[in-house]
Swiss-Prot record:
Organism: Oryza sativa subsp. japonica (Rice)
Taxonomic lineage from the root: Eukaryota, Viridiplantae, Streptophyta, Embryophyta, Tracheophyta
Name by which UniProt lists this protein: Aspartate aminotransferase, cytoplasmic
Cofactors demanded by this protein: pyridoxal 5'-phosphate
Pfam families with a match to the protein in the record: Aminotran_1_2
Enzyme class: transferase
Family under the similarity heading: Belongs to the class-I pyridoxal-phosphate-dependent aminotransferase family.
Further comment: In eukaryotes there are cytoplasmic, mitochondrial and chloroplastic isozymes.
UniProt xrefs under Gene3D superfamilies: Aspartate Aminotransferase, domain 1, Type I PLP-dependent aspartate aminotransferase-like (Major domain)
Positions carrying N6-(pyridoxal phosphate)lysine: K253
EC number(s) on file: 2.6.1.1
Quaternary organization: Homodimer.
Disulfide bonds: none
Amino acid sequence: MASSSVFAGLAQAPEDPILGVTVAYNKDPSPVKVNLGVGAYRTEEGKPLVLNVVRRAEQMLINNPSRVKEYLPITGLADFNKLSAKLIFGADSPAIQENRVATVQCLSGTGSLRVGGEFLARHYHERTIYIPQPTWGNHPKVFTLAGLTVRSYRYYDPATRGLDFQGLLEDLGSAPSGAIVLLHACAHNPTGVDPTLDQWEQIRQLMRSKALLPFFDSAYQGFASGSLDQDAQSVRMFVADGGELLMAQSYAKNMGLYGERVGALSIVCGSADVAVRVESQLKLVIRPMYSNPPIHGASIVATILKDSAMFNEWTVELKGMADRIISMRQQLFDALKTRETPGDWSHIIKQIGMFTFTGLNSDQVAFMRQEYHIYMTSDGRISMAGLSGRTIPHLADAIHAAVTKLK
């Protein structure tokens, strides 16, 4: 008979609010169930997609007899780091040309944020980070556990289902000088609401005037508009003024490498000399955390980014994914219009990227799960990438019923 465990007093932890949606979905035997919780792209048939260019890159790596499985340096694959910085900042970026960027390979977006957060907690004079309200559910946990104090700034206006720009400016305007500010580079998660370029410029001016430190999270480059350059405009605006910033990048969404955990943290510094020292300190954060990053996913990304034909093939496939999501938005909007669902649903086609913040409340979300077997997070966020022409009528029926029966 097993003896009593020293961990017997542990409480059962709750499911993750996002990943827990899939756990519940998997337990549901219904043939009409739809999972709109997790941000992973699905084909029109509802299947996970591996990009053709990714399969080709993997095959090339497998067929290369000189390829080995040795440890990478603490900072990761050098080619991957250079190409990642170039992708987000632009090939002609002055920061890159002047060697002012320290880039390290990390474990996708989450790992990049955590390494950046721990670096700031150790080496930056201000320990407070302002994050948008709402934001991705993991952001506050990542930064709190990294040793930072988390505050929020207004971002989303439920009344307009758009940006609360005035509230954003007021909150950042009253933040202490030098505070860190988390910014979603594009396709804000969970709202799908982004500032215009004019608004970005006002945000930049305000932040630089108060010496607020930008920390960008770029999880969807190319996925919002279908253009890699267009989706990086906000970031490049901040780099162009010569100021410093942090940038967390992920290839989970735009290359479909969810399970490979491929990402990068770049810190744009004031000089090349500072960048060298920053990199040396990033190594001291990474080494006791996970020693060094995995080789396979980064090799796939580097193979694609350094070959012009493969890069072009990737941009075509990426635009195809972005365009399908835009089409899903239009189809859902049209379906609700046809049903004469109460309310204004134009925000569905105005918002961009993988997610739509529907405006549905938690009771309506629970009703749709119970009655229609539709799974989403309790805040009403749906992953447009999980929809198809086949499932849209079912979702529209569910939304119509929820809005009609529950206020």
